[in-house]
Structures are given as structure tokens and as C-alpha cells.
Amino acid sequence: MFDILMYLFENYVHSEVELLVDEDELTKELTRAGFHQSEIIKALSWLERLADLQEAGTPYLCNHDQQSFRIYTKAEMEKIDVESRGFLLFLEQIKVLSVEIREMVIDRVMEIDEPTLNLDDIKWVILMVLFNAPGHESAYEQMEDLIFEQPDGRLHS
């Protein structure tokens, strides 16, 4: 499923090619690309749920204190490693992620049918969520810079 999400993001969203609106056509395209029907359905459902989260004002995403600290559940800690959790915290601290967007990211990560995701996978999920979050264009651009910027090895200038 994650491979399909990456395929869609890289071939349609990130390349600025117009995404096919018709789900049947998109399913056919993904099948021709070699993906299995069951995985396609899961990926499209994942994207629909992401869109629902953007529109719903889901209470669990909004019921928080700005000064609170996120405690991860056991299942979340098993799927999201320490490095990735630290990266999420870092993004909150530099204001790339709001608390609500962080919760959307965690929600979407937990719905991916992989036992664990590495930091690079988490970064792509963050990018997908930010891309689909109206009003977060600046955060999306910052996240893109963090993903695609190649460090030159120097810590100080």
C-alpha cells in the first residue's frame, strides 16, 4: 500500500501532473503499473480518509492544550521509531507541524499496513499530509526543503 501512495505522490502530485479524478481510471492505471487490486483499494481508502480528516474538524485532532506533550501509545511506539518521533517533535518546535497536523500524520502512519516505518517513510507521509492540508503551503515547502536538501557535511559555516 505504501508503494502505491509513493507512486501516486511522485507521479501525480509531486510532478504536478493532473491527478485522474475517476477512481476506476486511477485503479486501471495502478493495475497497469503492476499493483495488486487489494493494495490499490487500501491506498485509495487511505487517501479518502486523509481528505475526511482535513474536512471533519475531528475532535481528537483538536482537543489539546498547546503546552501539552505528546505521549505515544505502545502501538505507535512500535510503528514509529525513536528517531521518527524525535523528528516529529523537531518539526513541531520549528512550527512546520501544528499539533493537529502532527495528529493527522500519526493517524495516517498508523493506517499504513507495515509493521514499522523508517524516518524516510515518515517524511513522505508528512509531505502527503501537508500537501493535502489547505493553508499549510509554507509548511509543505519547508518540509520539501528538509527532504530534498542534501547536507554538505558541515555543521557550522
UniProtKB/Swiss-Prot annotation:
Pfam families: DUF494. It comes from the Bacteria. Coiled coil: none annotated. InterPro entries: Smg. Belongs to the Smg family. NCBIfam families: PRK03430.1 (NF002897). This is Protein Smg homolog.
